[in-house]
Amino acid sequence: MEGMFMSEYVKVAVDAMGGDNAPGEIVKGAVEAVNESSKVKVCLVGIPDAVEKELAGYTYNKEQIEVVPASEVIETAEPPVMAIRKKKDSSIVKALNLVKSGECDAYVSAGSTGATLVGGQVIVGRIKGVERPPLAPLIPTEKGCALLIDCGANVDARPSHLVQFAKMGSVYMENIMGVKNPKVGIVNIGAEEEKGNALVKETFPLLKNCPDINFVGSVEARDIPAGAVDVVVCEAFVGNVILKTYEGVGLTLIKKVKAGMMSSLRSKVGALLVKPALKSTLKEFDLEQYGGAPMLGLKGLVVKTHGSSKANEIKNSILQCIAFSEQKINEKIKEKLGMEELIADEAK
């Protein structure tokens, strides 16, 4: 499976029953993805009647979408480990097993984050040598975007884990986003090397002495939106706080701007003049454009989208899998982590 993506299509197993807007928005996103790209085939895993009812309203290439039956759904509130073990016919478990078996190359879900993270490791499995697979979403910055790694998978990370995060994040930004020699920073409470908690203090010299990444030192949270670094390294608790703050501030800002523009006749007239520029700017800070967060370091690509995902984010998450395939990210991660001998063995 680690030598994946050899078929005519990049095959993506999509959890059709996961998320607040399933199956409607999930199916719509899948249709939009195949209508936009002839390189992808989607396996919609879910309750057939519900999925096929949604599909009936769309026009698409029938060869590019397949419905894979699943009779169960893992709810967000369920304990992830227990749910993965007990609900073998759930849309999440069946979709992940499609990746494990090699029938599909990638997995996308807006469903239970815990079940996806647990299932990714237990079912799909880690690349040999990867200590902890991180969840790594793209976040908007003044200069484009940055990769936030980790944002939810490893709360109790070790220094060696963060070093691997930095390397995997560098591979992703360079090959998927086209950033040459991406700048790597570790989240800290100050720019000085001696600052930070025990984890940061222990990790800093390891990153500093790592020859195959462009480590620029500590990055404070306020400098992340300015684009100070391309790869934002942190353990999952810190990363999740950063991500949720990003989302919350963005929503609040949009509400405040809209309220201000409608507060008087003068502001309404002014709003008409600035609307095109404002709309363009706000679009740059829309997280949906990037799709979901990849879980790097697994044998197959696992992508987790927001639970509230609409069709556009699902579509972009599916299309993200094509770039992952074409750029051979897993092979490059192995190279970055010093696993050239593993690649040679698999090529025999």
Q: What role is predicted for each listed range?
A:
Residues 22-26, 89-102, 106-120, 127, ...:
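Short glycine/serine/threonine-rich phosphate/pyrophosphate-binding segments
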Residues 60-104:
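Phosphate/nucleotide-donor binding subsite
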Residues 15, 44-46, 68, 109-111, ...:
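Short beta-strand segments
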Residues 121-134, 138-148, 228-232, 236-346:
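Glycine-rich phosphate/nucleotide-binding loop
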Residues 24-25, 37, 41-43, 49, ...:
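Glycine-rich phosphate/diphosphate-binding loop of Rossmann-like nucleotide-binding domains
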